[in-house]
Amino acid sequence: FAKRYGVAESDLMPWHFQDRFLQEAPNLYPVDLGKYYRDKNLEQLTTDFYASIGLDITKMMAASDLYPRDKKNQHAFCTDIDGEGDVRVMCNITPSDYWMSTMLHEFGHAVYAMGHDASGLPHSLRGAAHTFTTEAVAMIYERNAYKPAWMVKMGIIDEKEAAAISDACFNTLRLKQLLCARCVQVVYR
């Protein structure tokens, strides 16, 4: 950070750090993923992606609250309303890499919930096996927003652009996951 801001290490102050609590990765690599999503319909990309892997989320998408409005909770979450298949997502999407990854993440929870909301199961079994299992599924899908190969498949960028940003995307994603692992260990200990 000292090099980035042109100050001596001894002169670094808290405001020089992007996230003092180390919950988000600092922007260290030369890729602006946000520019690739600025003119995209994240709702459609999310629906198309899950359809491409055989998961129909159109009913969940229609029942969800996805766009910002005044006084709305700014967080994002997925909730299984009744254990009978009424699964909804709450987001505040605007076209950005952050919200693309969030949509993939939250609908990852939703498809996981869709899988355990089988009508033949007793209600006591209609829930996540553990927080780690539902988070793992959600994080696997979330990662796609940062993967150039996925972005090509979804028509967001072309192969040439994918090759140009591949290393920076890999390093960005790796750093995000390392910091997430650190944060999770603090929260769950």
Model-derived regions, located:
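Active-site recognition of the HExxH zinc-binding catalytic motif
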Residues: 95-116, 135-139
